Regions:
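Short glycine-/small-residue motifs
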Residues: 128-131
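Conserved active-site tyrosine of GNAT-family acetyltransferases
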Residues: 28, 32-33, 99, 126
Length: 137
């Protein structure tokens, strides 16, 4: 058992990033860079682009990308769902107001809990993005 764990630890070298399926890579790049302030690292239109902030890499895969091809059983990868990237922000209420003024769609109202405040917005393809402001400690 110990050897299996060690082999698995050597097999996984680290976290590369998070992949989102998108319908229009150019539109998604504009959303993540202009609305959320991520950096554009790589862009190979129309197939894919990579944006980042800190150690987070977000890979935006368009319909023509190798990371978007159907599975062997015919199941198609599609945008949307509930799994999401969580981006830490300061002054969440202020950021919400700014984004609402530019027409960004939110799935819910800001929630406040013991760990902080959060809200879900959608990118142009319906992929959820959570904005999170940790509670003061």
């Amino acid at each position: 058992m110990q050897n299996t764990i060690q082999e698995a630890q050597r097999f996984v070298l680290g976290l590369w990033g998070v992949r989102y399926q998108v319908k229009d890579v150019r539109r998604s790049v504009a959303f993540y860079t202009q609305q959320l302030g991520l950096n554009l690292d790589d862009q190979r239109l129309p197939a894919f682009a990579q944006v980042s902030i800190g150690n987070l890499k977000l890979i935006l895969s368009g319909p023509g990308a190798s990371g978007s091809r159907p599975m062997p059983d015919g199941h198609h990868q599609e945008p949307g769902g509930w799994n999401r990237v969580i981006l830490q922000v300061a002054d969440l209420p202020g950021r919400i107001q700014q984004l609402q003024e530019t027409g960004v769609h939110f799935r819910n109202q800001m929630e406040v809990g013991p760990g902080g405040k959060q809200i879900l917005l959608e990118d142009a393809d319906g992929n959820p993005v959570e904005l999170f402001e940790p509670a003061a400690r």
